[in-house]
């Protein structure tokens, strides 16, 4: 059995609304560690008080263990590298797990972070749409970052209907870049 954990990079409702859905994992494995910045943990505490407040005892409520991240951390004997990025003007995190890096809701990645992204097998990064957006990468921005990082494979996530139909967009992408989809499983070393 694989240990279940969560790393939160931001607190937008669409990204954290599923927190309550970790119940089945809690029933199976017990306490679930959550890794996030202090800002994100504070917001989660307010939004999901019944989960985080220890003096509230609601049967079936998942037990989470919060871990404030400011730097790299260890999970299940693996180093997780914290990657700084920006969602518009808001600082957020991406994460590198071995040879896979994951970003969502990114608009910019500071230049000093790129050295942490060398020799990737897989990069998962957002590409919201074709047109510019004030707080998300568009397709061209994402492709420029992919070209700079040079992962073996890249998957575009956090895409909207404004990007186009899957088949039409996919055939225009470089051969190592793929549109992600629900249920996708990615293997890497």
Language model: regions and residue ranges:
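Binuclear metal-ion centers of metallo-dependent hydrolases, dominated by the metallo-beta-lactamase
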Residues: 110-124, 129-189
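Divalent metal-coordination and catalytic microenvironments
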Residues: 10, 44, 80, 105, ...
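Short internal beta-strands
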Residues: 32-39, 153-157
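Core dinuclear metal-dependent hydrolase active-site scaffold
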Residues: 61-112, 182-189
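Metal-dependent catalytic neighborhoods of phosphoester/phosphodiester hydrolases
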Residues: 18-26, 164-171
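Single conserved hydrophobic/aromatic residue that forms the stacking wall/gate
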Residues: 1-8, 12
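Active-site neighborhood of divalent metal-dependent phosphoester bond hydrolases
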Residues: 29-31, 40-66
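Short, well-ordered beta-strand core segments
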Residues: 6, 100-101, 123, 154
